[in-house]
């Protein structure tokens, strides 16, 4: 759903900030 997509995007953003490649 929409909330799932938003949550997934936020999770990916945070993960990218925590472990930048």
Swiss-Prot record:
It is found in: Secreted. GO terms for molecular function: nitric-oxide synthase regulator activity. Expressed by the skin dorsal glands. One of its GO terms (biological process) is defense response. Keywords: Amphibian defense peptide, Secreted. Disulfide bonds: none annotated. GO terms for cellular component: extracellular region. Has no antimicrobial activity. Strongly inhibits the formation of NO by neuronal nitric oxide synthase at micromolar concentrations. This is Dahlein-5.2. It comes from Ranoidea dahlii (Dahl's aquatic frog). The lineage of its organism: Eukaryota, Metazoa, Chordata, Craniata, Vertebrata.
């Amino acid at each position: 759903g929409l909330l799932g997509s938003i949550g997934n995007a936020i999770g990916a953003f945070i993960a990218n900030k925590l472990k930048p490649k």
